[in-house]
Amino acid sequence: MSLAGQYLLHPGSHPSIVGSRPVMGGARLGRLLRGQQGDGVVNMLGNVLTLCAHAQRRTACMVLWAAEKQEPAQVTPESTSLLQLETARDHLRSMALDWPQRQSQSLQPAQLKWLSGCQFPLATPPRALMPDEVAAQRQQMREGLKSATPCTPLQCLAQWQATAQALQPGTRTLDVLDTNPVQQAANLRTIATALAADPDFALRPQWQGACAETGVWSRLRQRKAAPAITSAWSRLQARWIEMLELISAPTEPTVALLSSGALPLGDGQAIAWCEMARGLLLHWVQLDEQHRVQDYRVLAPTEWNFHPNGALAQALTQLKPDDAPAAWCLASAYDPCVQCSVNIQEIPHA
């Protein structure tokens, strides 16, 4: 069994999403990390969950701090600025490299020419950048995107527009985070209780008894101001727009565009959250008396969005069985962080 997992999409079928990421269930992460502390936990999670590894490491640091100290983790302007840069990097990497392939294209040298001339590296750096490095890379990304206008990913958006506007998945956003801190703490405790009680909750999560989705369009900062997201097109656009917002924000933001933090729960427990490129990431930990990991759970955006009964699954079921372009368009709107493929059924002709 591959712990990394994969998803197979079946347009026009039920179930329309088959697969999972086994490492997230069966208390496997807890067993993998049991007895470890501090940097050992952080580095292991970054190596196991490699996509958006910076967010995994950040969230692990916060949850371990909150569980050991039993006080909220410190979120500094410098760490927030770094999170915004790395999230923008995640967005660009997915759009520049994944989108063309999901449109049945091979990556052509001409499509990547603007990337080869861009000083901004797509690879996540092996260490956390210093503030001056963050500022320099933000500038590099802004300069590099100036030459992206005629190329991917804007070409991909233009090619998807008609298809994506016609795809109208149901919308029930995950609203665990809240502008009211008392309500947010209650919501986080509810999730923590579910994670602790059920080792497989992170594989098939539900919020208040139903499936929910998380993404750029469900950010805490936009909860009251953002227009309703009704189409795959809205979701795809939101990712491009947020990337531009993240690299254009002040170097030391006074208001965080991405929410993150940790809540101590008592008795060596804590839960931490981080708004990352694909949506809301949650970590829960139980430490023993020596501050070593006794149990650990990670609840990632992909498990919400690729739930077999969620909005994406229902939208896939409504497609024609041979509609691979629409299936890939939907998948890109929700952006899985594990391997994903589309299974097409041949329609017999009379």
Features from the language model and the residues they span:
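Active-site bordering "gate/hinge" segments
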Residues: M1-R278, T302-A350
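A short beta-strand signature within small-molecule sensing/ligand-binding domains used
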Residues: L281-H283
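Acidic, carboxylate-rich catalytic segments that either coordinate divalent cations
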Residues: Y296-R297
